Regions:
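Short His-Asn-centered micro-motif
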Residues: 10, 72-75, 127-129
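Tryptophan-centric aromatic hotspots in well-structured domains and transmembrane helices
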Residues: 17, 22, 75-76, 114-115
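Substrate-recognition element of Asp-dependent hydrolases with the DxDx(T/V) motif
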Residues: 62-83
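Short, charged/polar micro-motifs that form catalytic or ligand-binding hotspots
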Residues: 48, 72, 143
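Active-site neighborhood of HAD-like aspartate-dependent phosphohydrolases
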Residues: 1-64
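C-terminal cap/substrate-recognition subdomain and adjoining C-terminal extension
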Residues: 80-167
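Structural motif
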Residues: 7, 68-69, 123-125
Length: 167
């Protein structure tokens, strides 16, 4: 099957799960308090991610391009829980999380390559805070670990997809 568009993001951490800081404790969240501030960074067992703004930017991108999500994060060890974390963090149920990449020795680019050989698609973006994406470095929109997906990342990903679709 040829997928119309795939949207990959390789890590939850540094993409949609970033270190969030608050002045006041946030209700129903496990926070680390230090120096008068409250810090939030989630783990899979929290059943959510910390940066709900980044989740909304991801959702907007998916809706705009009718894109699906393939998880390449280490959180994919428990795929169902990883999906639950996304939806619990505000991702609309209309956005499909369709699969995860295989576990291979080496780097993420090889895992994405293995997945693409089984599921070819003409246009995709990799959202990641790392750069081990060969042979798909041209599809990478690199995020900053501390901020994840922002409006600037969204705009870069949008432009990259538009460029791929116009060829």
């Amino acid at each position: 099957m040829l997928w119309e568009i795939q949207l990959y993001f390789s890590t939850f951490d540094g993409v949609i799960n970033t270190l969030m800081i608050y002045k006041e404790p946030i209700k129903a969240r496990r926070l680390l308090q230090k120096d008068g501030y409250y810090f939030d960074l989630c783990y899979p067992q929290d059943k959510r991610v910390s940066n709900t703004q980044a989740v909304l930017w991801l959702e907007k991108l998916c809706k705009e391009f009718n894109a699906d999500i393939v998880i390449t994060s280490t959180w994919r060890k428990d795929y169902e829980l990883a999906c639950e974390c996304l939806y619990n963090s505000g991702l609309s149920k209309t956005i499909r999380v369709i699969d995860k990449t295989p576990w291979l020795d080496g780097y993420r680019g090889a895992e994405i390559d293995a997945w693409l050989k089984e599921h070819p698609c003409p246009a995709f973006v990799i959202l990641d805070d790392d750069t081990d994406m060969e042979p798909y470095i041209d599809h990478l929109v690199k995020t900053d670990f501390d901020t994840g997906i922002t409006v600037m990342i969204y705009e870069r990903a949008k432009q990259l997809l538009q460029n791929q679709l116009s060829k």
